[in-house]
Amino acid sequence: MMVIRPVERGDLAGLMQLAGKTGGGLTSLPADEKTLSSRIDRALQTWQGTLPKSEQGYVFVLEESDTGTVVGICAIEVAVGLNDPWYNYRVGTLVHASKELNVYNALPTLFLSNDHTGSSELCTLFLDPDWRKEGNGYLLSKSRFMFMAAFRDRFNEKVVAEMRGVIDETGYSPFWESLGERFFSMEFSRADYLCGTGQKAFIAELMPKHPIYTDFLSPQAQAVIGQVHPQTAPARAVLEKEGFRYHNYVDIFDGGPTLECDVDRVRAIRKSRLVTVAEGQPAPGEWPACLVANEQYDQFRAMLIHTNPTCERLVLTAAQLDVLKCNAGDTVRLVRLCPEEKTA
């Protein structure tokens, strides 16, 4: 069975293997053992309650419970930008006009922004390509909403997610090539690695301080502003169906979109509800896939089951209860995995 659980120190080797499969561009999952080890430690300290809010971050792994193999990772930062500035570009407009000459130009412009300071962030989502099947990607992404719903007071009012921008298989980023490289004088992969390993001071030191007219960028760079990497398109669609929207903020490195939503308006959080579990054989029938999660902070578990999403009493097998760290009579959180498609 596939189960989501908190990261553990013993997961380091598995995370290093995952990091080696990302192909670059996933800043928060560098193939660097020291960085990943520190990330695990920070997550454990977050659960232990020893870190200030500005440093808190939860990390979860997707595990195949029979073998203990780690096949995916996802994370939540509690509040971004409270220690180091959290940058993105806001895509706006500057108007240049002259009535006398009958000239009016509305020019798209990039403004450096820290507008999302203090927001919670969904990040570090990666699933081993060999395991991209049977709803694993949905489980990995949406399990975080179950955790946020159960422990709502630990997160802020808004949640954001930076989507991976357009980068080709060689690591070439049109946006970086046309803009970032001119200010940072390094390749995209180098800047990405420095950022991922916590060496972020160079951003504040070298960032352009004034608005950038996008017309000055290459046509290729202009075309990818707010666009996602082809492999990231499904993840964007998943979040948009949960209520996330693009409000004209993009990543400073690759131009990928930042999606955002009020936490309490996220569908899976808003519609999740508590039910009592019982042990037995689930009723037969063609039931939809649902997310189920326990309500245990330190021993959080989440998995997919097929059941009636409106049931008042959830029947699980002994094996499912064991994986969820639950007993009959316990309370669990339940929500339909995907929103129902509206029919005309």
Curated annotation (Swiss-Prot):
Pathways involved: Amino-acid degradation; L-arginine degradation via AST pathway; L-glutamate and succinate from L-arginine: step 1/5
Domain of life: Bacteria
Binding site residues for succinyl-CoA: 125
Catalysed conversion reaction: succinyl-CoA + L-arginine = N(2)-succinyl-L-arginine + CoA + H(+)
TM region(s), chain numbering: none
GO terms of molecular function: arginine N-succinyltransferase activity
The keyword Transferase is annotated on this UniProt entry: yes
Enzyme Commission (EC) number: 2.3.1.109
Catalytic residue positions: 229 (proton donor)
InterPro entries from the UniProt entry: Acyl_CoA_acyltransferase (IPR016181), Arg_succinylTrfase_AstA/AruG (IPR007041), Arginine_N-succinylTrfase (IPR017650)
Alphabetically ordered keywords of this record: Acyltransferase, Arginine metabolism, Transferase
GO biological-process terms attached to the record: arginine catabolic process to glutamate; arginine catabolic process to succinate
Pfam families in UniProt: AstA (PF04958)
Function: Catalyzes the transfer of succinyl-CoA to arginine to produce N(2)-succinylarginine.
Protein name per UniProt: Arginine N-succinyltransferase
Species per Swiss-Prot/TrEMBL record: Enterobacter sp. (strain 638)
